[in-house]
Structures are given as structure tokens and as C-alpha cells.
Design a protein with these regions (language model features):
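Catalytic loop of the DD-peptidase/beta-lactamase superfamily, centered on the K-T-G motif
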Residues: 2-3, 8-16, 22, 35, ...
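Short, solvent-exposed turn/loop segments enriched in Gly/Ser/Thr/Pro and often Arg
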Residues: 22-31
Length: 311
């Protein structure tokens, strides 16, 4: 049984989540759907839905706040929903129990500014908020972000869905709502976090400037461009095809990573992905002892080995 069918049968249908699905194909048939937005080249603009069904369990549930509220009702009800026990209280309690300790450092100091402890349960981040256990998880895909949080002791849960990717507003708005519900003093959580967020943005910009400044001008590729064309393979990511088209190299890597290569320095090329959500990347080619192209390094996606040409 597929993951999609299992969720529909065991979760969506029993909870009455009639507008919830797990694929972009199903979502695209609806007339009442938000358009995703993302900052692309510094400007907020609509972006296309990305088909990520192959990693569906990592973040492919399409829903609305009414449906998601039913999920939280079941969580806060110890597995019971409208008088029926859909999951045992012991099972849910185990998912809300710390399994892995998380060091509160780096970005976590922004997301959880007052937390005294942090851990990960089974699909939930766990920390403390105003002296009570906070159970929550956020996530994002291109142009969309979600935040689902609850404080079981206070019997309160919150769902915030946005059609803007990369925003931290849902996290801080959640805290603001919890404060109001529990009668706590009002705090502008986002304003307090802003200096740290800006500092991280400056670090990112500085790293990018450093990379640009490291370019060695006046260099040329070791070989003719046609020698770099071919198929390269990664056991994890599959094939990337480098082609010579009209005197320029292009890269084809799945449905989203397609772009034109521009010489950077030596045997390194900058690739400008046509899907501007992905920005730019680098491809560093390596030669073997015979002076032939042996592999290409694609940064975070790792090394791809040259596939011998068919004779």
C-alpha cells in the first residue's frame, strides 16, 4: 500500500480532512488554491509548484487550516476524535517524548529564543515555552511554509499556513498567539529576532562576496569545451548531462536543474539555472592522469563520475 493511500485511509478520512491530499497533481485540479511565492533574485514573485512526490513523506501534504485543526484535535485528545480512539494515547505520548537531544545554538537561538532545552521526538520538535512543553514542527517547500504547534498542558494548538517560502513569521506569530491565549505579557517576538536574522543574512552575503572575490581572472579551461560534454553519474542523484550547444555548455539534471554554464576560472564553470528559484551553482571538472575529464563536482550534490562514451 502506498504512503498516499495509507494516509488517506488511516488519517485523512477518519479525521474528515476532505480537502487534504498528498500530490501536486491532485492539488492542481482544485480551483481554490493559494499561489506559492518566493524571493527570486531578490524579488518576491509567484513560483511554480514543484513535483516532489518521490519524497512525499518529507513534506507533500497539501491541506488547509480547517483540516489541519482536526489533526491537532486528535493530538490534543490523546488519540481520540469525535468519540473514537484512532490512535492509542501511549503511541502519541511516545511521539511527544524526547528521542534526540538538540544543542540550542546557531539558528535555534532565533527559532526558540527562551527555550531551556531542545530535543526531537518522533516527527516533532520539543522544547519549553512559558514553563510548559511545546510540541511543534514547521516546514517549507518552494513558495509555501507551514507551522503546526501545540501546548498539550494548555489544550491549545495552532496551525499557520502561508504562501511565502523562507519567512519566519509563522514561528513568531505562533508565540504571539500562545501568549495571548495563556494571558502572558505581549512581546514582539519578530522584532526581537530581527537583529539576529539580519546578522545571518549578512554572513550569507559575505560568504557569497568572498566566493566571487576568489575568482581568478585571465584563465582558460584546460580543454576544448566539447571535451567536457558527456554524461556524469552519481549513485545517489543519478545522471547529469553536459551538452555543447551553439558554442556554450549546458547542464541537464532532472526536470528542475537545467541551465547554461559560463567559464569561471580554470576548469570551474558557473551554472545559471533557468529555474531562478535555484539561483546559481558551480561545476568543477577534474582531469585524470591522461588529461581526460574524469568527474565533475557539483558542491552540495557531490561528485559525479564521467560515464564512458558509447562506441
Amino acid at each position: 500500500k502506498s504512503w498516499d493511500d495509507f494516509l488517506t485511509e488511516r488519517i485523512f478520512t477518519p479525521l474528515g480532512m476532505k480537502d487534504t491530499n498528498t500530490t501536486i497533481r491532485t492539488l492542481s485540479k482544485s480551483n481554490d488554491v493559494s499561489t506559492p511565492h518566493q524571493k527570486v533574485d531578490g524579488k518576491l514573485q509567484p513560483v511554480a509548484w514543484r513535483l516532489i512526490d518521490n519524497i512525499g513523506p518529507a513534506g507533500s501534504i497539501n491541506s488547509n487550516v480547517v483540516d489541519m485543526a482536526q489533526w491537532l484535535r486528535m493530538q490534543l485528545g490523546n488519540g481520540k476524535f469525535d468519540g473514537k480512539q484512532l490512535a492509542s494515547a501511549a503511541t502519541l505520548d511516545e511521539t511527544h517524548t524526547p528521542q534526540t537531544v538538540i544543542r540550542r545554538e546557531g539558528p535555534y537561538t532565533i527559532f526558540y529564543p527562551d527555550a531551556h532545552f531542545m530535543s526531537y521526538g518522533m516527527g516533532w520538535f520539543l522544547s519549553d515555552f512559558r514553563g510548559k512543553k511545546l510540541v511543534e514542527h514547521g516546514g517549507a517547500i518552494d513558495g509555501m511554509r507551514a507551522e503546526v504547534a501545540m501546548i498539550p498542558e494548555a489544550n491549545v494548538g495552532i496551525v499557520i499556513l502561508t504562501n511565502v517560502g523562507g519567512t519566519l513569521l509563522p514561528q513568531f506569530l505562533t508565540y504571539r498567539i500562545f501568549d495571548s491565549y495563556m494571558g502572558q505579557p505581549t512581546r514582539d517576538w519578530q522584532a526581537e529576532a530581527l537583529p539576529k536574522i539580519q546578522a545571518l543574512e549578512k554572513q550569507g552575503a559575505a560568504a557569497q562576496e568572498k566566493a566571487l572575490a576568489s575568482r581568478v581572472t585571465g584563465t582558460k579551461p584546460s580543454l576544448d569545451l566539447k571535451e567536457y560534454a558527456g554524461k556524469y553519474n552519481s549513485e545517489m542523484y543519478g545522471d547529469v548531462e553536459i551538452k555543447l550547444d551553439g558554442g556554450k555548455l549546458t547542464a541537464e539534471f532532472g526536470p528542475y536543474f537545467n541551465g547554461e554554464l559560463e567559464h569561471w576560472n580554470y576548469d570551474t564553470f558557473q551554472v545559471k539555472w533557468r529555474d531562478r528559484v535555484e539561483g546559481n551553482g558551480f561545476m568543477q571538472f577534474s582531469l585524470n592522469a591522461r588529461g581526460k575529464v574524469a568527474s565533475v563536482d557539483m558542491g552540495a550534490m557531490g561528485n559525479f563520475t564521467r560515464v564512458p562514451d558509447k562506441k
